[in-house]
């Protein structure tokens, strides 16, 4: 028996030929409904991968509308999770660690026309409204008032509570997504 790991690559179209140049991903998740793999690249592209034929497609060119001040060259580590709430299983939550914010996207409602213009919905983090530098820190409160400092991994309980590993503040934060 040969236990050598198999190297599998994603088959990229012409549009995706350079998507991974100076770009990477930190996490991926499988959607329970469509059985596709989703990831958000460092530069913000939402990518869907079909695991059966290994083809990929860019669903959105950029999650968030963060102005980085460098012509869009800066990116963010992204950590993602689908909602467990019945009826919202296609809602993907995206934690943008370097921007101190959380965004969400309903992947079932994305159309080809959205690719260039839609950035998802801002969800939590004062940095969305006050900017990356002013909005980071430590503050609990409502979604728009919460301050994060490098929010990373996201996970959910069955009743819709989102737990966020806020690594810069060395704590676990909780958001009730049903409110």
Q: Could you tell me what each predicted segment is?
A:
Residues 1-26, 53-80, 112-152, 168, ...:
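Gly/Pro-rich loop segments of beta-rich domains
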Residues 30-31, 37-43, 92-98, 164-168:
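Conserved beta-strand positions in repeat-built beta-propeller and related beta-rich domains
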Residues 151-154, 162-164, 172:
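Hydrophobic packing within well-folded, soluble alpha/beta domains
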């Amino acid at each position: 028996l040969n236990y050598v790991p198999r190297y599998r690559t994603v088959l990229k179209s012409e549009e995706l030929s350079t998507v991974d140049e100076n770009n990477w991903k930190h996490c991926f998740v499988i959607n329970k409904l469509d059985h596709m793999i989703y990831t958000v690249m460092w530069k913000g592209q939402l990518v869907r991968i079909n695991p059966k034929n290994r083809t990929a497609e860019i669903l959105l060119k950029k999650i968030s509308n963060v102005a980085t001040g460098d012509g869009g060259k800066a990116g963010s580590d992204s950590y993602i999770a689908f909602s467990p709430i019945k009826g919202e299983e296609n809602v993907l939550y995206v934690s943008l660690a370097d921007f101190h914010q959380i965004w969400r996207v309903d992947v079932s409602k994305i159309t080809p026309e959205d690719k260039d213009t839609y950035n998802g919905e801002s969800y939590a983090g004062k940095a969305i409204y006050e900017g990356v530098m002013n909005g980071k820190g430590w503050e609990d409160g409502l979604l728009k008032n919460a301050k994060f400092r490098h929010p990373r991994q996201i996970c959910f309980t069955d009743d819709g509570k989102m737990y966020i590993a806020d690594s810069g503040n060395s704590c676990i934060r909780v958001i009730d997504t049903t409110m």
